[in-house]
Amino acid sequence: MVKAAVTGAAGRMGARIISVIGDTEGIELVGAIEHSEHYALGQDAGEVAGVGKLGIEISSDVDAVVKKADVLIDFTFPDVTIENLAVVSKHKKSAVIGSTGFSGAEMEEVKKIASNISCIIAPNMSIGVNLMLKLVAEAARTLGDDFDIEMVETHHKLKKDAPSGTAMKLAEVAADAVGRNLSEVGVFERFGMTGARGKKEIGVQTLRGGDVVGDHTVYFYGTGERLEITHRATSRDTFATGAVKGALWISGKAPGLYDMQDVLGLK
């Protein structure tokens, strides 16, 4: 039985992860974490998540919670994730990281800390999106420079980072497939007299509104035709299910950095 701890336990994602853990064989919740000033501290994690009493109090003591777990599932913010990973590394546990919005320097810090543990880092845990990553790479390689690559992502109005981590990963995959460096060809804003589109540009546009869980579309524009690859998430359960699948998979794995492509056998 894999013993899991969940950060952000009183948040939208944390609640769904706790619910999915309860419905999944081979894994159990042993700890729930929130920040030191959260209103839910001391409350039962199951009751806060809406799944009934579990006998596990939400705590801000990351060290104590991680110590009794096998794997930490972390959907928080970059600075919090880095702090949590340091504790996971200290106790030689495993981690599943779904946080997004990392800067280049922050991601390097994450990789450095996580290098001596078994750790999954993925901007999107859904099965559909991870299959989409593979399809986008294949389409980009096949269509090559004859097709313009653009993408649009939409999320709920409360999302703090933009573009989404998933959109950035899709753009990176497409750029790699056609031999380009996204930092050189990525275009994240167009306004005014921008001139004609550069042949090698990869555009990423962001929309925010309502309660959209997550929509991503990659467009390949050719002459006289257009290919669209779209994924729409209608429930956070798709991410929670992937995270729990990842927690089951990573337990007992050799130290190293993995992603959901490894978990799903898509590599």
Where on the chain are the PLM-derived regions?
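Residue-level detector of anion-binding/catalytic polar loops
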Residues: 71, 94, 118, 148, ...
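Extreme N-terminal starter segment of soluble prokaryotic enzymes
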Residues: 1-4
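Short glycine-/small-residue-rich Rossmann-like dinucleotide-binding loops
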Residues: 70, 76-77, 100, 206-208
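Rossmann-like NAD(P)-binding element
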Residues: 63-83, 89, 93-94
